[in-house]
């Protein structure tokens, strides 16, 4: 199709705003189709009411046909991925009279055939894409929409059978959320459904595909901005476009459009801009603006909030290797956060507000949206914009090798284009990443020998995967002018490689998978720690829900069903014994598991923050998709585990730490607060009976954004002969305690 690119400039200046009343007719209308749905499978004699958006498994549960998969061990008995399901909706449709009408599905999971009034509209094969079908045979009454969704496991069997190669993970053959096929924190739930919004859209001369604002450059007193509007133009037309806030016209222009896809660029300048900053660095300010587009047939209006900021991933060479550091508005940032996974195994229950507020409350400034889940909805990213949570966005590829045929690549191409168009304008978006652990797996997991590939097959398999992540995806980003940086694979090096400590990001799993003690984090600190973690039980509230009246036991069928890691229970128990003790009751055992997790991971975070070479800490994982024994700091109910409280202190703007380094007790003061400040460090030494032995103070000038100071702590002579003493560290101003830390030589 014809692609028009238009560049028109205007300085933002004060004007009186025009009244919307001059545009009385809308040239776009959207009508929801999320009501009056039924579903029927081959095992159901009659159709039953369905939830849309929703999921087949949850529909069965709502009708009492299966037990809730999250209770007891019922998830082990699910068999909902093996039957086709028909979703039907009958609706009347009077009143929409536009020359162009589309039926739009924002998400179908996954392989579906769509009929409207008996006419085949098309098929779907990617749950990560929007599907749009042109419709012409709507009736005012008694329209019948049918979506026949194929059983995912049956489709998968046919795809695997047709594959040129035996690939390590079958799920790689389909564009469906990988975690639904089971992970070491998630149940096997390969279900199906219409999982996002469905609607009919009507429009006149054009359809707005997407619009966004990018920051081109920030100078001392101004910011150079770019409004980009992407249109599907149906007929040659003249378009009057206005982009404005309550105080400013940013853009006001008239352009002539030809039929085809048009990408319009409108540069503008904001004088004395208020900048967007991540949480803890300053205000996450968003300019509220409206985009209005008028033709002779009427007007379309869209609310657009945008931030003025630059975010770059700095990867310069240095004396150690290569820096891996995010820089926001010219200021280096230590990334503080975690890895985010889908909030529900069936993608039906999400509470973005509460979960993201918990991130802010724990002093996060970044989340990594992990590549085995989903691209989140608009509300998620809008909240991250307003809360100041930067997003490291994986594309949805994880822990697998992917097929290399053209149809698969074309499918991915459309997915990437859709998602980047949708998300690129968010102030929170810091990085696009091609995948999770694909490169790591290829070089370190031994798949070549496990699957007995020939040398020629190995070359071809790796070639098609490097094409996917090193060519296809970055080429789309480049051709589309995506400003955010791109990383082909995370981690850059696996945790067994020396390079993982000197360049790129690091998934350090020597602790846990390698069964190393927590102290190993101090020997294996990389430039950016993007995965590390340790498991614990969920909260008591979650345990009570899982057991549904049955007695909680340390080892039971229920607990085994909710522990997805092959040696997780053993490792929790052994580590508990190593650092603390093993309680006798199940309630105390669960609480102690949380204390172990909180101790180990918060100690690691504090250490990472003291190391000048390290620029980020994203622990595994923030949240759960179901009631689980897992690495999360917040359980499925949104309840904080002990780790989240510990992380709140470890990620605080001011942080203290003490640790034995080369036979010396070292003390650290770290701050990323956005202001210079004179503070006082108080050191109180207590003997093994809790008696105060010695007190000293140090005055420190804390520098804005990136302060680290370290010093030797001299243990009082009277305490050197035993290990029962404690050091209480406090960082204070005249009227405020900024940070605390307790050190004990026992640990």
For the regions a protein language model found, what residue spans apply to each?
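Active-site-proximal loop/short-helix segments
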Residues: 123, 387, 394-395, 620-627
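Substrate-binding clefts and catalytic carboxylate motifs of secreted carbohydrate-active enzymes
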Residues: 31-32, 41-45, 179, 186-193, ...
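Short acidic-aromatic active-site loops that bind/stabilize oxyanions
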Residues: 76-84, 345, 370, 583-598
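Active-site proximal loops enriched in glycine and acidic residues that flank catalytic Cys/His/Asp
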Residues: 337, 371, 393-395, 433-436, ...
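Active-site mouth of glycoside hydrolases
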Residues: 132-136, 148, 153, 165-172, ...
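Generic detector of well-ordered alpha-helical packing
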Residues: 107, 124, 394-395, 438, ...
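Secreted/periplasmic carbohydrate-active enzymes, especially glycoside hydrolases
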Residues: 1-12, 17-366, 610, 639, ...
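Flexible loop/turn segments at secondary-structure boundaries
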Residues: 110-112, 154-155, 314, 342-345, ...
């Amino acid at each position: 199709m014809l692609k028009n690119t238009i560049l028109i400039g205007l300085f933002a200046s004060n004007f009186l705003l025009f009244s919307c009343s001059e545009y009385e007719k809308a040239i776009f209308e959207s009508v929801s189709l999320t009501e009056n749905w039924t579903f029927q499978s081959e095992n159901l004699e009659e159709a039953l009411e369905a939830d849309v958006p929703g999921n087949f498994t949850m529909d069965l549960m709502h009708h009492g046909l299966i037990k809730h998969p999250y209770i007891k061990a019922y998830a082990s008995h699910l068999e909902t991925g093996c039957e086709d399901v028909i979703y039907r909706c009958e609706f009347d449709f009077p009143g929409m009279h536009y020359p162009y009408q589309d039926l739009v599905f924002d998400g179908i999971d996954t392989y579906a055939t769509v009929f409207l009034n008996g006419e085949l509209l098309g098929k779907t094969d990617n749950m990560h894409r929007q599907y749009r079908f042109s419709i012409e045979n709507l009736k005012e009454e008694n329209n019948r929409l049918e979506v026949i969704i194929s059983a995912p496991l049956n489709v998968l069997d046919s795809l695997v059978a047709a594959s040129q190669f035996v690939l390590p993970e079958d799920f790689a053959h389909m564009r469906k959320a990988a975690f639904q096929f089971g992970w070491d924190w998630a149940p096997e739930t390969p279900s199906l459904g219409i999982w996002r919004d469905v609607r009919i859209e009507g429009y006149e001369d054009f359809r707005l595909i997407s619009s966004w604002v990018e920051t081109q450059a920030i100078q001392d007193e101004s910011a150079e901005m770019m409004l980009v509007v992407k249109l599907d133009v149906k007929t040659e037309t003249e378009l009057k476009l206005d982009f404005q806030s309550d105080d400013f016209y940013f853009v006001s222009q008239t352009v002539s459009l030809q039929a085809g896809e048009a990408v319009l660029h409108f540069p503008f300048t904001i004088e004395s801009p208020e900048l967007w900053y991540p949480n803890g660095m300053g205000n996450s300010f968003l300019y509220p603006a409206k985009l209005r587009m008028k033709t002779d047939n009427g007007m379309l209006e869209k609310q657009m909030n945008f931030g003025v900021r630059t975010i770059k991933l700095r990867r310069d060479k240095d004396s150690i290797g290569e820096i891996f550091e995010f820089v926001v508005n010219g200021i280096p940032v230590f990334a503080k956060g975690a890895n985010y996974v889908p909030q529900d195994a069936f993608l039906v229950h999400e509470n973005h507000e509460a979960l993201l507020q918990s991130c802010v409350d724990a002093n996060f400034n970044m989340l990594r949206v992990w590549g085995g889940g989903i691209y989140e909805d608009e509300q998620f990213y809008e909240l991250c914009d307003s809360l100041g949570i930067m997003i490291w966005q994986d594309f949805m590829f994880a822990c697998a090798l992917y097929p290399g045929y053209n149809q698969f690549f074309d499918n991915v191409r459309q997915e990437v284009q859709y998602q980047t168009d949708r998300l690129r304008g968010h102030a929170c978006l810091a990085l696009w990443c091609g995948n999770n652990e694909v490169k790591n797996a290829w070089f370190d997991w031994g798949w070549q020998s496990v699957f007995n590939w020939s040398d020629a097959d190995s070359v071809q398999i790796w070639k098609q995967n490097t094409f996917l992540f090193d060519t296809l995806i970055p080429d789309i980003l480049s051709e589309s002018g995506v400003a955010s940086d791109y990383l082909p694979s995370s981690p850059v090096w696996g945790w067994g490689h020396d390079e993982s400590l000197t360049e790129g990001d690091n998934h350090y799993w020597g602790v846990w998978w390698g069964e190393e003690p927590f102290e190993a984090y101090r020997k294996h600190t990389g430039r950016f720690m993007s995965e590390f973690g340790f498991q614990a039980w969920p909260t008591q509230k979650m345990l009570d829900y899982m057991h549904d009246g049955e007695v909680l036991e340390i080892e039971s069928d229920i607990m085994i069903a909710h522990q997805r890691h092959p040696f997780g229970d053993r490792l929790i128990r052994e580590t508990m014994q190593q650092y603390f003790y093993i309680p006798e009751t199940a309630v105390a055992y669960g609480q102690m598991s949380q204390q172990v997790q909180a101790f180990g991971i918060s100690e690691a975070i504090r250490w990472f923050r003291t190391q000048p070479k390290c620029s980020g800490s994203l622990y595994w994982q923030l949240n759960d998709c179901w009631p689980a024994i897992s690495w999360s700091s917040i359980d499925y109910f949104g309840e904080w585990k002990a780790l989240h409280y510990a992380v709140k202190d470890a990620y605080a703007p001011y942080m203290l730490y003490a640790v034995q380094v080369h036979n010396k007790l070292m003390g650290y003061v770290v701050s990323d607060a956005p202001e210079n400040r004179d503070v006082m460090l108080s050191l109180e030494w207590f003997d093994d009976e809790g008696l105060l032995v010695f007190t000293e103070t140090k005055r420190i000038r804390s520098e804005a954004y990136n302060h680290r100071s370290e010093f030797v702590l001299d243990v009082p002579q009277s305490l050197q002969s035993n290990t029962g003493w404690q050091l209480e560290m406090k960082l204070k101003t005249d009227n405020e305690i900024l940070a605390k830390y307790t050190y004990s030589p026992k640990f």
